[in-house]
A protein has these predicted regions:
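Alpha4 helix (beta4-alpha4-beta5 surface) of REC/receiver domains from two-component response regulators
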Residues: 62-69, 73, 80, 86-104
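C-terminal output helix
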Residues: 89, 107-116
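PAS-family sensory/regulatory domains
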Residues: 173-185
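Active-site beta3 strand of CheY-like receiver
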Residues: 47-54, 58
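PAS/LOV and related PAS-like sensory modules
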Residues: 17-18, 131-154, 161-165
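Acidic catalytic/metal-coordinating carboxylates
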Residues: 36-39, 60-66
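PAS/PAS-like sensory domain cap-loop motif
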Residues: 163-174
Length: 185
């Protein structure tokens, strides 16, 4: 395992320190501790952690869920939520940020390590998929022939510039339309 950089966002300093010690023993580098959502965003911008362990309830100024949404949108940093709350409303709000994990307090070392390993593996997989998608799109856009891709239902999901010229449709306008509506043989 490489030395992954972790940021802990926890408003209880004793809990934060306990997690920091556990992570150090597991071989992770804790690059920052934050006690509020605003601090989390600021320190993430400064330290660029590989992953963030985020308490959901951080106070009224900015919740952990709001901070996680900002980290995802602006920095693409994955978040694992740490919480003592498992009610439906909290879980529904947390899911909107597409977290990489959800640990219910109190948790043991094995649960923490497993959740981190799975989240970091998923992050690496997501990054690879994104790189492959970008490479494929660049390749298809540079082909001199018209290329139109559809999903399993025959709806347009991609058109290169040559296909746009051939059909008279812009990719953004054709996306989601049935191929028969866009291209007539």
């Amino acid at each position: 395992m490489g030395r992954y950089r972790v940021m802990i966002v926890e408003d209880d300093p004793i809990v934060a320190e306990d997690i920091r010690i556990k992570l150090g023993r597991m071989g992770y580098e804790v690059v920052a501790l934050a006690a509020t959502g605003r601090q989390a965003v600021s320190k993430a911008r400064e330290h660029r952690p590989d992953i963030v362990l985020m308490d959901i309830r951080l106070g009224a100024e900015m919740t952990g869920i709001e901070a996680a949404a900002e980290l995802k949108e602006n920095y693409q940093i994955p978040v694992i939520f740490l919480t003592a709350y498992t009610d439906e409303d909290t879980l529904a709000k947390a899911k909107l940020t597409e977290p990489y994990g959800y640990l219910v307090k109190p948790f043991n070392d094995r649960e923490l390590k497993s959740c981190l390993e799975i989240a970091l593996y998923r992050q690496a997989s997501d990054r690879k998929i994104s790189e492959n998608r970008q490479w494929l799109e660049t390749t298809l856009n540079s082909i001199g022939d018209a290329v139109i891709a559809t999903d399993e239902n025959g709806r347009v999901s991609f058109m290169n510039p040559v296909a746009e010229m051939l059909t008279g449709w812009k990719e953004a306008d054709a996306a989601g339309k049935r191929i028969q509506a866009v291209f007539h043989i």
